[in-house]
Amino acid sequence: PGDRGFGITATGTKARRDLHGYSTVAVDPNVIPLGTKLYVEGYGYAIAEDTGGAVRGNIIDLYFEPGSNEFKRWFTHNTTVYILK
């Protein structure tokens, strides 16, 4: 949190959880290109804006606001992800 780049994605946007719009997710850009819009069952609409060290293959990383307890039910979770056109 003290890092100036904290919360800034690989695409240069600020990471966000938007319950009424598109939230940030991290993806493997070799599988899902950055900028791709997605629908994640149980999470909502998202846009692939970031990457991560543990995000490989069909693994994605959902963004949650710091201090939110929402992540607890998603810590390790399998769900369906739809790529939107």
Label the model's feature ranges.
Residues 1-85:
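Solvent-exposed, well-ordered loop and adjacent helix/strand elements within mature globular domains
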